[in-house]
């Protein structure tokens, strides 16, 4: 308190000192004898009367007046600022039209985080749930694949299954759309160009395995040597019946007959590329608190920016019944000049014929223990080299998860609550997305007994850094303006999007 009093009293002392230094002319009778006079002072000059101590010209009155003026001006200034910021950038021109806001600069995105594999079998301790340790184990380096047991509790797994059942599941289909066929026609690829694309060994002849390597699906049907030859016979593409097409035979074939044949033949469930049912569960505002908590765990696990994780696809929940499977595929498609990512196409303002899923990471959760089969297979994990043609040797197609799952390099057995995650792209050397990692080829083995439940969290990143930044900026703007329910509207189960993942 003493210090405070001293602080308050200090200006008064200064005022007294300053007042004592004021130079007012004194009447002659009050001047000390011998006092010096300034030029212009004279006895006859009119004498300026002294102000009364409480008069309007006193220093105290002057200080009070200045304080009042400053307070008044401050209030006026504050009022003007309030009006200005309340109206934003409203135009002062008459009329109801609002000035068009200048576009915000697109932010620059930092590098994408990527966990180091170190070596197969390497374990590290992490905390994705407060107060609880989890262990991440490296399963392979090509692709960069990890396993984290106990990521979900048994109760959380059962809840996710329950929520999916309440919403309702639909059959998972992979079918080319009419738009896909129209786009293919619009590209005007000659049959000679198509033949050269399929002819991998450039011997001028199309063997069955060359056709199978590129033509992985028809009307959702998994193509095998048997049904390829059946199609050849139906459309009379192989007159000599040797199962090999020459350039002349291929040129004589009408591709419209091929599409007509595929549309007219309905595939059985065991002949499909995938035999499962699925649904989507959102994880944003308004979702069940467990769903939001899982997203936060994924955020801590991946160490990616919140914007990337939050604006990625909802959680996909999949049920494989007995006999269910998913032949080997990659989760992301390569982006060519003719393609665009599904999630950024709304903001890209580009006209391209094809779209594809751009999934930087896959986080897969096992929601139950499977009685028989149902492993996740990575056929070429940690191979020294990758060659698409080597996937099909003699009668063995490593992509066929119904027949040859046991021949894959790595199989992960479903265990309730365990998560596995991997990167679908190689790094580009500049902290962003590079080429698709061919070693990320994976599939769901045949469920021989019981039912298999899984869930997928896909993290979407556009290989174009600028498009990804624009997408995040636009989604953030929509969220601020209440234009979406915490997430963009995803159209992720379109037939061609799924089909493109397979190509």
UniProtKB/Swiss-Prot annotation:
PROSITE patterns: EF_HAND_1 (PS00018), FE2OG_OXY (PS51471). Disruption phenotype: Mutant mice exhibit inflammation and fibrosis of renal tubuli, glomerular sclerosis, enlarged Bowman capsules, and develop late-onset proteinuria. Vision is compromised, primarily due to impairment of cone function. Ca(2+) 2 binds at residues 238, 240, 242, 249. The chain crosses the membrane at residues 62-82. GO terms for cellular component: endoplasmic reticulum membrane. Its cofactor is Fe(2+); L-ascorbate. The keyword Lyase does not apply. Glycosylated. It is an enzyme of class 1 (oxidoreductase). Signal peptide: none annotated. PANTHER family: PROLYL 4-HYDROXYLASE ALPHA SUBUNIT, TRANSMEMBRANE PROLYL 4-HYDROXYLASE. Catalyzes the post-translational formation of 4-hydroxyproline in hypoxia-inducible factor (HIF) alpha proteins. Hydroxylates HIF1A at 'Pro-402' and 'Pro-564'. May function as a cellular oxygen sensor and, under normoxic conditions, may target HIF through the hydroxylation for proteasomal degradation via the von Hippel-Lindau ubiquitination complex. This is Transmembrane prolyl 4-hydroxylase. It comes from Mus musculus (Mouse). The gene is P4htm.
